[in-house]
UniProtKB/Swiss-Prot annotation:
Cellular compartment(s): Nucleus
Description of how the protein assembles with itself and partners: Associated with the spliceosome.
Similarity field: Belongs to the SLU7 family.
Main location: nucleus
Annotated protein name in UniProt: Pre-mRNA-splicing factor SLU7
Membrane-crossing segments per the record: none
Summary of the function given for this chain in its UniProt record: Involved in pre-mRNA splicing.
A GO MF label: zinc ion binding
Region (Disordered), start-end ranges: 1-114
Protein source organism: Yarrowia lipolytica (strain CLIB 122 / E 150)
Keywords for this protein: Metal-binding, mRNA processing, mRNA splicing, Nucleus, Spliceosome, Zinc, Zinc-finger
Length: 416
């Protein structure tokens, strides 16, 4: 095996240290040439114009720290004394669409080797990979021992990419791939036209009109100004309107707290815990050292003691009232006969003048004017869509009742 070439005090060729030393040497040589050119310009003698790789003449008055490229940006075959601004320009060798990785390229069209080469894959005979990385079917007798049907080398692309192109998420994207999606959509539209006939396509104006119609329909579902709110329909004092669920709740179901929210009554252990919390808060407000969370046992004992004291005070008050007025068993209830005045001949209840009963309706009930035996509104005529009396089918509210004659006359008119 041949040893790597060494230069400059035994440094290997291609090492970073060697490149740095060569760059320093080139800079020194370039500096000497730059001094010679400067002396020639002072003496008024002509000098050879400096050109770049593209043949453009460079400005000789460009500072050296700008025109000289760093050692890591210089190519091996460049003139070390040449000054150029190419290293400051945008890299034109960046990978483009045609310089991308080979996709789906078949090796069958490439030239195959005729004999096994040293260092090639022992399975297929390609030089670009080893046996452990081979993607071909494992052969019973490898290509190393039987040079039959050797495979060509893999197509390895090495596109030159800059720092930005390596981190570009769309780098390598081929817009032609989206054409397949467009073709699928076009095929679907053609099939729909065949199924639904050759109907004209909907224009943009028609689509906009359809959207406006949908918006107009949705606006009709809005609440009218004449609508009455739910909490105004039932003004019963025994019910409470819950704004959260928009329903009415009775006092048996819960109550409204200080924040205006509906709180449902608890049962079982939850009710006991709520009562215990209420007692603990009340005692804490009075200055007693009762804390439900810090010492729940002491709080429970104190709550039990407070309940017993309240029951004892209630029993003492009840006994005092019984001693003063007697027990409930000895209290005589006022007879029902004394609640109203009844005459012997015609038993009618005489009430006070200011007594008002529960009004069922604002209209007068059981009033039969005009010799009618039924009330107004007991009959409905479907043909004329009017209300009337059921006794004579009269549709005039102030009309006089004619009995069965009115029904017969109405029936004869319907038959005609």
């Amino acid at each position: 095996m041949s040893k790597p070439a060494t230069t400059l005090d035994g440094l290997q060729d291609g090492s970073v240290e060697l490149q740095k030393r060569l760059s320093a040497k080139r800079d020194a040589e370039g500096e000497l040439k730059h001094e010679e050119d400067r002396k020639l310009r002072k003496e008024g003698k002509t000098q050879t114009p400096v050109t770049n790789q593209e043949g453009d003449v460079l400005n000789p008055y460009i500072p050296r720290f700008m025109s000289s490229a760093p050692w890591y940006a210089k190519a091996g075959d460049d003139d070390p004394s040449a000054s150029s601004l190419d290293h400051l320009k945008k890299d034109k060798t960046d990978s483009k669409k045609e310089e991308w990785y080979a996709r789906g390229q078949d090796r069958s069209s490439l030239e195959r080797p005729k004999k096994f080469r040293k260092g090639a894959c022992e399975n297929c005979g390609a030089m670009t990979h080893k046996k452990k990385d081979c993607m071909e079917r494992p052969r019973k007798v490898g290509a190393k021992y039987k040079a039959d049907n050797l495979q060509a080398d893999d197509v390895i692309s090495n596109p030159h990419m800059s720092w930005d192109s390596k981190r570009d998420r769309w780098n390598g994207y081929d817009a032609e791939d989206f054409k397949r999606v467009i073709d699928e959509h076009n095929m679907t539209e053609e099939l729909q036209k065949k199924l639904h006939g050759d109907a004209p396509a909907e224009t943009d104006a028609e689509k906009a009109a359809a959207v406006e119609e949908a918006i107009r329909k949705s606006t009709r579902t809005l609440r009218l100004r004449e609508d009455t709110a739910v909490y105004l329909k039932d003004l019963n004092s025994e019910t409470v309107y819950n704004p959260g669920s928009r329903t009415f709740r009775t006092a048996d179901e819960g109550y409204i707290d200080k924040d205006g929210m509906f709180v449902r009554h608890t049962t079982g252990e939850g009710k006991e815990m709520e009562e215990l919390t209420r007692i603990a808060e009340a005692e804490s407000a009075l200055g007693n050292q009762i804390h439900l969370h810090a010492n729940p046992t002491a709080a429970a004992i104190a709550a039990k003691r407070i309940k017993e004291e309240a029951e004892k005070a209630k029993d003492a008050e009840k006994r005092a009232l019984e001693e003063k007025y007697g027990k409930q068993d000895h209290v005589r209830v006022r007879p029902k006969e004394y609640t109203s005045v009844v005459t012997a001949k015609k038993p009618t209840v005489i009430r006070a003048k200011n007594a008002q009963g529960i009004a069922v309706s604002k209209y007068e009930e059981d009033v039969f004017p005009g010799n009618h035996t039924s009330v107004w509104g007991s009959y409905y005529d479907k043909e004329t869509a009017k209300w009337g009396y059921a006794c004579c089918h009269c549709l005039i509210k102030n009309g006089y009742c004619v009995g069965e004659k009115g029904k017969k006359k109405k029936g004869a008119m319907d038959t005609v």
